[in-house]
């Protein structure tokens, strides 16, 4: 299914399509002056707006969303409320050391609980289920790496609520021979990301936040001690600005310092038609857990509340240009469909009804970053690397503290003002990304080359 034009926002993902009719907020017309302006109506932007407004009920806060709430990564992702910070803990420890790895895990752990509590406390209609997540291996080499990860987590004391499952246990639960072993993380969940982000918008508006939709920011300037955002039909002048555009940050004009902080890379998903009772019985999966595998180019898959299965990942695209017109990837969609059938041959006749894709924010050192620009009028957040459902919400609380000039346990977290390694200029950046991408594909191919009826490799 081709990705449809941007005028059809409801078609950008299965989640948006299943949401049904959506009435976006009015665009900005004329000029407005506020205390805090936030560019980006996703998880980061709306969470920041909510938290700052709770702290400062009398403050004026405006969120400017270029498309509609739910259009970007916050409405297109897999909906995994999970504890992964950046990449695996081995990578974090190698780059940042023992103590920062532990702190990062605790932050991610707190973020998962934060999302769950906010949904429960505010009765958000997010289709949330706290069912846990498996990290599975298909090959002996993948399983050895999985065991090393678990042993490191034990060594660091961050293995709470994590258990190891054998192939026999997995086979009994899921009726497939493909899983060689797994780590099971109990304290994780899944949600419908488009419903959830629009629930955050509803809550923010109820608290007095103004959300302008279909209001792209064309130019950012910093006159005097203010920040000015020019839009097609007006302008916002603010005392402070939060840049919460993540993967779309590269498109902003007026903040050249942020251009090389991160790059967008594209991931893709498919979703089945609702499975019949017989199909569900044939594969087990009675407890509705979510999955990631232990590849370099991971697959992520999960059930939906209406009885479907989503499957994403397996490969990415790293375009060489600055456009965001890269949501169409038939080869990767076909791979995702075949991979689900490879795991569950019982589903060889299952139909797929939706296919979509979108960009995620990737820093060169594969670590999230929150920072302040210059005189601290501008705060930015980038680099969740496709694992941002949980992190973005707690990041919103952290950014609200920064906006308020507070020094808290969160603002002391080591990613604040860490100054990410910048991506090099083009074409060096593209050539480097391409080489890394091909290396990861080769890694997965080599580790999976002896798998039976191997459909996990992308050409």
Segments and roles (model prediction):
Residues 76-107:
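Glycine-rich active-site loop/strand segments that organize a redox cofactor
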Residues 144, 152-154, 177-240:
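Helical element adjacent to the flavin cofactor pocket in flavoenzyme catalytic cores
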Residues 362, 402-436:
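Active-site-proximal substrate-binding core of FAD-dependent oxidoreductases
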Residues 113, 121-129, 217-219, 225, ...:
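Active-site substrate-recognition segment that forms the wall
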Residues 2-11, 17, 87-93, 117-131, ...:
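Flavin (FAD/FMN) cofactor-binding and adjacent substrate-gating region
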Residues 53, 339, 392-412:
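Internal hydrophobic alpha-helix adjacent to the cofactor/substrate pocket in enzyme cavities
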Residues 53-76:
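Glycine-rich FAD pyrophosphate-binding loop
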Residues 1-36, 54-55, 59-60:
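Extreme N-terminal leader/targeting segments of oxidoreductases
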């Amino acid at each position: 299914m081709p990705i449809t034009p941007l005028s059809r926002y409801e078609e950008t993902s299965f989640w948006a399509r299943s949401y049904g009719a959506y009435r976006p907020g009015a665009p900005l017309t004329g000029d407005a002056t506020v205390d805090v302006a936030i560019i980006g109506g996703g998880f980061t932007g709306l969470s920041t707006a909510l938290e700052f407004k709770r702290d400062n009920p009398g403050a004026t806060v405006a969120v400017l969303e270029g498309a509609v709430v739910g259009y970007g990564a916050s409405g297109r992702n897999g909906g995994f409320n999970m504890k992964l910070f950046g990449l695996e803990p081995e990578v974090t420890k190698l780059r940042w050391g023992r103590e920062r790895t532990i702190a990062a895990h605790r932050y991610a752990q707190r973020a998962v609980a934060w999302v769950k509590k906010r949904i429960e406390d505010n009765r958000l209609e997010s289709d949330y289920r706290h069912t846990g997540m498996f990290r599975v291996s298909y090959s002996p080499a993948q399983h050895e790496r999985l065991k090393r990860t678990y042993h490191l987590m034990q060594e660091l004391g961050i293995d709470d609520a994590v258990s190891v499952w054998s192939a026999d246990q997995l086979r009994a639960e899921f009726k497939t021979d493909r899983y060689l072993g797994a780590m099971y993380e109990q304290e994780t969940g899944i949600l419908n990301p488009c419903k959830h982000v629009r629930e955050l918008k509803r809550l923010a508006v109820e608290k007095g936040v103004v959300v302008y939709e279909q209001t792209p920011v064309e130019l950012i300037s910093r006159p005097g001690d203010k920040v000015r955002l020019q839009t097609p039909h007006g302008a916002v002048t603010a005392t402070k600005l939060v840049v919460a555009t993540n993967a779309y940050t590269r498109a902003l004009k007026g903040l050249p310092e942020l251009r090389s902080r991160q790059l967008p890379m594209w991931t893709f998903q498919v979703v089945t038609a609702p499975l019949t009772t017989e199909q569900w019985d044939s594969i087990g999966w009675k407890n509705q857990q979510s999955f990631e595998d232990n590849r370099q180019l991971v697959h992520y898959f999960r059930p939906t509340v209406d009885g479907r299965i989503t499957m994403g990942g397996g490969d990415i695209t790293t375009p060489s240009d600055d456009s965001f017109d890269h949501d169409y990837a038939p080869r990767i969609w076909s791979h995702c469909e075949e991979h689900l059938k490879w795991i569950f041959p019982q589903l060889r006749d299952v139909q797929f009804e939706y296919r979509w894709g979108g960009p995620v924010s990737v820093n060169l050192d594969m670590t999230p970053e929150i920072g302040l620009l210059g005189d601290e009028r501008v705060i930015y957040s980038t680099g969740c690397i496709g694992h941002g459902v949980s992190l973005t919400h707690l990041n919103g609380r952290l950014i609200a503290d920064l906006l308020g000039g507070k020094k808290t346990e969160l603002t002391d977290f080591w990613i604040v003002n860490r100054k990410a390694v910048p991506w090099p200029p083009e074409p060096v950046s593209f050539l480097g990304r391409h080489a890394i991408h091909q290396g990861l594909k080769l890694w997965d191919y080599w580790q999976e080359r002896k798998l039976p009826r191997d459909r996990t490799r992308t050409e």
